[in-house]
């Protein structure tokens, strides 16, 4: 049901407690293990596609066809000192048809040169983010919500958040949105629905 945040918490806990899935040891492991990642709940499987474009083509369309790159607003909530930054972004030099070279920032976590580029429609870390949002919306104590966010941040090697840094629930809701950007940004379209709920 719309706005059934208690049920969202229950379902998130069910997945988190399942022996079938689990968090990878590091953020990079998610993308290095690809289809074999224990963190993936839902993905599209196309192992060894006949041509790279069969799998990467849909990624290219979803992420701007190689035309778009992270905006300054996106990068403002994703500091370079966050260990996920290095896993998420890279800068490549391209040469156009006129022989001119230019650099473009790419979504490194999606690109695998072999063509085995899994789609991460939903993974375990997202369950923690959903749980944190639902807890905040059901008036759980700020410290409890921050503790859930820190499970994701600690695995990523990011600096833990402190409850005292959030003087009101709105500032913590903004942090939940930002943490979604950092953790699952450009993976599955979930940020759109989160933005609508905000």
What are these regions (language model features)?
Residues 1-57, 79-198:
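Acidic/polar-rich alpha-helix caps and helix-coil junctions
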Residues 62-75, 79, 84:
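Short, cationic low-complexity segments
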